[in-house]
């Protein structure tokens, strides 16, 4: 075998794709030096050992290394039931979903048995909800970063108009934020961000007492709360100072409540202790502060989810799961054996990012996941689904393949790394069923043939966004939108519909030198707007487009708060650092409540009167 042939064989054996198809359908070849570099980074995971986990769907039969003799299935409670192979020597798995062990004499093999589909509320057909960038919300005393308290008025509006879901931006624990902060580059996805949890909601007496004792702190909190944009480093420092002061007040003046905090920490056990030790090392400070901060965050979001469900929301809060984590964060450090050490996640060049994207994050190694029985993936799902009614998985295609590149390399010099899609899907569906948690998979961009159909068959909803929901003939009419999807007018990476209609994103990109011929781009956008106006047949394209969205057969429609408020500037401009205020804009201090109520009623009425 020649050197090139051996390299290609080794690459394919490791799950790398030496050839891939770009957005235009062109076949692209990965350079040999890229394959060698990525293979070298994968070598430690390839040599690791562990206990594998088989997965299956209820009613399937699996091939296990046993004999035709007596065997049994053992459930999580230790109860046994007989197991018998079929005529082909395969073993039919139990009909009850769960984590089982097949046992034959001393031989035990773990098998996860998943239901056919992810969970969905039985009586919910065409629901709707709101989507919030939590850090952008406003509430008194938020100290410059929107938090859980800012959700309350929006949950009240949701209840008033019969909505069923409230989708959150990522709430993962972060690194000490700098000016380039992104919620999609977390320190640890298994734990929560205390900067976006309200002390005034969790411990109001202690929080106010801390401000009374420290008047300079109180003054700084008031000033930061009124700011138009987020100063992440300054606001984070302010919130941590307040949190430490509130913890001391709680310990001294409210021993009963402090006892509840300590009881929760004891129940969380070694996992919390390990995280807090790493967080204190990464961020500096006292591990006790981080433990208290996690209680505050857990308390706030659990309370809000319960409140939403008790007020009639069939789904409640929807979490957002980032595709990876910071390579120097707590998650990567605590699970180093499961991570893609020396590799960075990103995206290949496409029509929107001609140089590709390097995201500055790492993720799980598929080789390590298999050898560790998928334990890191399962624990992550359980952490994110806890006290939530849904989870949106950013870049769901990462369950199938991810673009990886050596750290520091150009995003063009990457390669697709394949993941065990069926095993990961089975585990995702099983945990969804166990947690009663809806699953949404963000499937925008270049999607391999058949993947959307596979996800839909397992009850994982895709995402359809108005500017992209079209074919060669133009924008799709409402009845042609996917049923197994979430319908949205925009996302955090796009301008709100009002900004898209006016070309705000194009002007920003031209200002940053990313568009050379702005007049031509604006002319194309005007043509798109005209086509959309012709489709909706209304006097106000923005409102009528929301009406079209509401009338789709999609199982769920989500209205970002920026669209609900009629804003025009987008949250994040992908591919930019510094030139655009990514993740820093806050919602206005005041809004036109009558216009907002009218828009919410418009969407709600469209869902009630649309397709069954």
What are these regions (language model features)?
Residues 182-212, 331-355, 414-425, 460-472:
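Acidic, His- and aromatic-enriched active-site or binding-groove loops in soluble protein domains
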Residues 43-70:
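Extracellular ectodomain segments of secreted/surface proteins
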Residues 314-376, 380-383, 402-417:
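Substrate-binding/active-site clefts of carbohydrate-active enzymes
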Residues 293, 297-311, 373-460:
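Active-site neighborhood of glycoside hydrolase catalytic domains
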Residues 11, 100, 158, 278, ...:
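Conserved, mostly hydrophobic/aromatic
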Residues 40-44, 59, 75-78, 84, ...:
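Acidic/aromatic-lined carbohydrate-recognition and catalytic surfaces
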Residues 443-568:
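Conserved alpha/beta catalytic core and glycan-binding cleft of carbohydrate-active enzymes
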Residues 71, 96-105:
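Short, aromatic- and glycine-rich surface loops/edge beta-strands on solvent-exposed regions
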């Amino acid at each position: 075998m020649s050197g090139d042939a051996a390299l290609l064989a080794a690459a394919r054996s490791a799950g790398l794709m030496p050839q891939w198809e770009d957005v235009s359908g062109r076949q692209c070849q990965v350079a040999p030096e890229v394959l060698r570099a990525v293979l070298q980074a994968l070598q430690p995971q390839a040599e690791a050992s562990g206990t594998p986990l088989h997965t299956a769907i209820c009613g399937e039969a699996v091939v296990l290394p046993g004999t035709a003799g007596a065997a049994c299935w053992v459930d999580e409670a230790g109860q046994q039931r007989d197991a018998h192979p079929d005529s082909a020597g395969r073993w039919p798995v139990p009909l009850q979903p769960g984590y089982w062990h097949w046992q034959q004499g001393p031989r035990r093999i773990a098998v996860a048995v998943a239901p056919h589909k992810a969970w969905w509320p039985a009586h919910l057909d065409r629901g709707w909800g709101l989507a919030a960038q939590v850090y952008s919300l406003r509430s008194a005393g938020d100290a410059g970063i929107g938090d859980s308290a800012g959700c309350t008025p929006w949950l009240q509006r949701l209840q008033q108009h019969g909505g069923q879901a409230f989708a959150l931006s990522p709430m993962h624990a972060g690194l000490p934020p700098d000016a380039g902060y992104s919620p999609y580059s977390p320190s640890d996805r298994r734990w929560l961000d205390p900067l976006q949890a309200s002390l005034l909601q969790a411990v109001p007496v202690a929080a106010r007492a801390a401000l009374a004792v420290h008047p300079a702190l109180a003054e700084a909190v008031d000033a930061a709360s009124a700011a138009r944009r987020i100063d992440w480093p300054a606001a984070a420092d302010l919130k941590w100072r307040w949190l430490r002061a509130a913890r001391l007040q709680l310990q001294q003046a409210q021993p009963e409540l402090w006892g509840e905090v300590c009881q929760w920490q004891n129940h969380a056990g070694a996992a919390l202790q390990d995280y807090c030790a790493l967080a204190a090392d990464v961020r500096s400070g006292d591990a006790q502060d981080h433990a208290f901060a996690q209680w505050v965050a857990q308390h706030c979001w659990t309370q809000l989810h319960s409140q939403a469900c008790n007020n009639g929301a069939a789904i409640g809060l929807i979490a957002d799961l980032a595709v990876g984590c910071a390579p120097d964060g707590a998650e990567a450090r605590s699970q180093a054996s499961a991570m893609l050490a020396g590799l960075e996640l990103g995206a290949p060049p496409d029509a929107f990012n001609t140089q590709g994207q390097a995201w500055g994050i790492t993720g799980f190694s598929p080789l390590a996941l298999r050898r560790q029985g998928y334990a890191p993936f399962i624990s992550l799902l359980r952490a994110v689904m806890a006290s939530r009614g849904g989870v949106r998985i950013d870049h769901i295609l990462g369950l199938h393949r991810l673009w990886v590149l050596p750290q520091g390399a150009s995003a063009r010099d990457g390669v697709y790394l394949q993941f065990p899609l069926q095993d990961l899907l089975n585990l995702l569906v099983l945990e969804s069923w166990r947690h009663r948690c809806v699953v949404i998979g963000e499937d925008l961009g270049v999607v391999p043939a058949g993947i959307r159909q596979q996800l839909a068959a397992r009850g994982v909803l895709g995402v359809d966004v108005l500017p992209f929901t079209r074919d060669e003939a133009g924008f799709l009419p409402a009845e042609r939108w996917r049923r197994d999807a979430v319908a949205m007018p925009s996302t955090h990476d796009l301008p709100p519909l009002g900004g898209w209609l006016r070309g705000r994103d194009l002007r920003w990109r031209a200002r940053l030198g990313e568009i050379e011929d702005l007049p031509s781009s604006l002319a194309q956008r005007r043509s798109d707007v005209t086509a959309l106006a012709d489709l909706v047949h209304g006097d106000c394209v923005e409102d009528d487009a929301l009406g079209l969205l509401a009338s789709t057969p999609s199982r769920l429609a989500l209205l970002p708060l920026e669209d609900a408020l009629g804003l025009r500037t987008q949250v994040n401009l992908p591919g930019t650092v510094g030139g655009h205020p990514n993740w820093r804009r806050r919602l206005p201090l005041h809004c036109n409540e009558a216009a907002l109520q009218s828009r919410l009623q418009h969407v709600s009425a469209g869902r009630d009167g649309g397709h069954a």
